[in-house]
């Protein structure tokens, strides 16, 4: 088997506004465009990485928070309606997600070998968080590449930032080893909002910002 590799990583913003601005058919609310600069950045990243023909996208999301261990989406498919709790008028997204369960299980196994607590999410009715959905959608709106969804285990940070960072490094090393063993070509998405400062009001001219 060919050795797998991480072919790229993306600091992948997940505000729901950018999906809203796209007017994608999976999202129910309609917009007059908007947030173009961030969307253009995604378009450039999308073109760059999809040309490399990745086999899988790995999304690590802070909005899937777990207290005991690192959790992984563990069903071949997840379907449902994701509604943003802060901006329900912008994001009501009908998702249909394919998961690379084999790779997810391999990462979980590698993590356990390194002393991490890991768990597979086997509930078919589990509602996938919008951080995972937005970052994966903006990188691949066709949704024709399977994903691996990884939770954000916050409990080590209750002790100290150093302990939390040590856990993240071990998770990253386990992820790398699993990808290499799997033979997959993977793109890593660090789902985030950086400053976490959202627009709280919507301008009447948002759709004409770059006309």
What are the roles of these predicted feature ranges?
Residues 1-3, 44-54, 134-140, 174-183:
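Short amphipathic alpha-helices and their capping/turn segments at secondary-structure boundaries
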Residues 2-110, 114-118:
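A short aromatic-anchored loop/beta-hairpin motif
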Residues 18-20, 24, 71-73, 79-80, ...:
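Active-site His/acidic residue clusters
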Residues 55-61, 150, 184-192:
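Beta-strand elements within well-structured catalytic alpha/beta cores of enzymes
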Residues 65-69, 129, 195-200:
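Short catalytic/ligand-binding loop motif for oxyanion handling, primarily in non-cytosolic enzymes
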Residues 95-173:
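Cap/lid and interdomain-hinge subdomains that line or gate substrate/regulatory clefts
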Residues 161-207:
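Active-site beta-strand/loop microenvironment that shapes enzyme catalytic pockets
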Residues 209-211:
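Conserved small/polar residues in nucleotide/adenosyl-binding loops
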């Amino acid at each position: 088997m060919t050795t797998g590799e991480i072919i790229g990583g993306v600091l992948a913003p997940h505000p729901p506004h950018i999906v809203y601005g796209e007017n994608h058919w999976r999202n129910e609310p309609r917009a007059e465009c908007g947030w173009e600069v961030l969307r253009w950045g995604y378009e450039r990243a999308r073109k760059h990485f999809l040309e490399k023909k990745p086999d899988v996208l790995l999304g690590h999301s802070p909005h899937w928070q777990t207290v005991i261990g690192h959790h992984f989406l563990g069903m071949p498919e997840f379907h449902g309606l994701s509604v943003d709790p802060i901006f329900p008028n912008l994001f009501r997204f009908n998702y249909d997600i394919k998961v690379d369960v084999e790779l997810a299980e391999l990462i979980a196994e590698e993590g356990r070998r390194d002393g991490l607590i890991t768990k597979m999410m086997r509930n078919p009715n589990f509602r996938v968080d919008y951080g995972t959905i937005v970052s994966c959608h903006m990188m691949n709106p066709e949704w024709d590449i399977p994903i691996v969804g990884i939770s954000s285990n916050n409990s080590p940070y209750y002790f100290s930032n150093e302990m939390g960072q040590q856990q993240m490094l071990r998770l990253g090393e386990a992820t790398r080893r699993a990808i290499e063993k799997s033979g997959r070509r993977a793109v890593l998405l660090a789902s985030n909002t950086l400053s976490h400062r959202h627009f709280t009001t919507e301008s009447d001219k948002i759709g004409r910002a770059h006309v």
